[in-house]
């Protein structure tokens, strides 16, 4: 029975080797898929978020009407200044702000000015958003 056990050992080795080869390629494939996914993932939350944000929007789509009203309204014969309606950020602006916020929690003045200009927002709006 000696040759038999020897060939059994050899077959086992070949099987183990094959198995390792398979798990190796599967492992590297999984790692590759994972790295691609994690690389793309910073943007996924934004798309989902902006999508949800857009769905919530429609009820409040009359900022134009509010802005068209005069800044000062007469109340009991006294002029009363009307506060500007709350800014509604577009989903694109929100996504860009969030992306920037993930990189740096605090913006220096020039960075803030640049970001505000690129998004068509005021620096104050950007500052408040970052708070």
UniProtKB/Swiss-Prot annotation:
The keyword DNA-binding applies. Residues 82-131 bind DNA. The keyword DNA-binding applies. GO terms for cellular component: nucleus. Signal peptide: none annotated. It is found in: Nucleus. PROSITE patterns: HOMEOBOX_2. Its main location: nucleus. Keywords: Developmental protein, DNA-binding, Homeobox, Nucleus. It comes from the Eukaryota. This is Homeobox protein DLX-4.
